[in-house]
Structure formats: C-alpha cells, structure tokens
Design a protein with these regions (language model features):
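Compositionally biased, intrinsically disordered low-complexity regions enriched for acidic
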Residues: 4-147, 151, 163, 181-200
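Tryptophan-centered motif/residue detector
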Residues: 152-155, 176-177
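Eukaryotic basic, amphipathic alpha-helical target segments in cytosolic regions
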Residues: 156-164
Length: 214
C-alpha cells in the first residue's frame, strides 16, 4: 500500500513511485500473490498461476505493455496501478509520452482518435461488476465471478501476468474473438494500410489487442 497512488496527478508523481517501489517484469513469477490497491479497488489480491506472458489460450496482437507504449485509452487507463504491474510497462510508455495521469488526451492514442465508451456506459451495459444488468454475459456483472471493474483490458493485463479464472477467462477470450468483426468491416471498406479509413474502428481493434494496421 502506498497512499501516494491515490494522489497521482503528474508523470513526475508516477516516476517517483516507480523509482521507489516499482517491480521489474523479471521479478514476477508463478506462485506470486499480487496485492491490488488503487483508486477503484483496495484489498483485492490474486495469485499468478503461470509465469507472465506464458500459456496463453489466445493470440493477442500486442502485450499490455506494448499497447500502453503505442498509445491506448487516451493515456489514462492504469496510471494508479503502478505497483500491480511491471514497472517497464509504465517506464516505456512514459518515455514515449503516452501516459496522461491528469486529463485524458486523445492525441496520444495510436490512431489519434477516441474509440471507447465511458466507464458509466460499461456499467449500464453489464460489462463490469456491480452493475446488476444481465446482458449477453451476465457473469461479467457479478463481482463474485468478475473482479475486474475496469473492463476487458484490465482482465487482459491480469491474464497476461498469469492469473487464471477459468469461467471469466473463457468469456473474455470469446469477446476478444468476436471483436474480429471490426477487422472484417475494415477489410471490406478500406484499402490495405489506409489508416485514415475507419480510424476509430482501428483504434478500437488495437485496444482489444487486434492488429489495427490492416
């Protein structure tokens, strides 16, 4: 626990914490227990069943760290999770000027466009725990099954790190697979590599770890 996490406003705040307490990727191993303490959740912990980045049941385009460094979620997604994930994820994104702990900034996104709904919309849609809404995957709104209040990308980060929750993992991987429909729409309507064609869809693909450079 580090109370400075709750007061992060600048990149300098982030780098100070990373220098003091950040953990390198190589220090995370199967069997570790990860303690979660951030602005949205305190007191949650999970175990790493496998080593980070191994034994994946699907083939994402990029790792979470690569996605942050390339530009995702307006630079605003995990900035209070510095002590949960590898320090390299944040250092690399900071060096590339891709994080915005103050206000979200669309210009840091890979395609320079906004491509997501606000968290309040996710709650109303039943995509995150605590909403009570029963959508296509009612398990997602059940906090006993889904501990990831920030949605799919948070699940992906924890899955990549080595956490395994079979029921939740199956649902989130199926959602990832279903997102390929956007790739089909881009291929049907855009010339190959024309990044100015459907940039929002491309950014959305990227934020679900699919190839946006179709």
């Amino acid at each position: 626990m580090d109370k400075r996490i709750l007061k992060i406003k600048t990149v300098e705040d982030m780098t100070t914490i990373l220098k003091d307490k950040g953990r390198p990727l190589e220090s995370f191993k199967a069997g570790d227990t990860i303690q979660v303490w951030n602005k949205m959740k305190k007191g949650y912990s999970y175990s790493l069943t496998v080593d980070p980045g191994t034994e994946m049941a699907f083939k994402p385009y990029a790792s979470p760290g690569e996605m942050l460094a390339m530009g995702a979620f307006e630079g605003k997604y995990l900035n209070d999770c510095l002590l949960e994930f590898p320090a390299e994820w944040f250092w690399n994104a900071i060096m590339l000027d891709k994080l915005r702990p103050g206000e979200p900034d669309v210009s840091v996104n890979l395609l320079g466009v906004d491509s997501r709904q606000p968290l309040s919309f996710w709650v109303k849609s039943g995509w995150v725990p605590g909403s009570g809404k029963k959508g296509m995957h009612p398990e997602l709104s059940d906090p006993k099954i889904n501990p990831d209040e920030r949605g799919w990308f948070q699940w992906y980060c924890r899955y990549w790190m080595g956490r395994r929750l079979p029921v939740l993992d199956k649902i989130q991987i199926s959602r990832w697979s279903a997102f390929t429909r956007h790739a089909g729409q881009i291929k049907a309507n855009c010339s190959p590599g024309d990044l100015e064609c459907r940039p929002r869809q491309r950014q959305g693909l990227f934020q679900w770890s699919h190839n946006p450079f179709l």
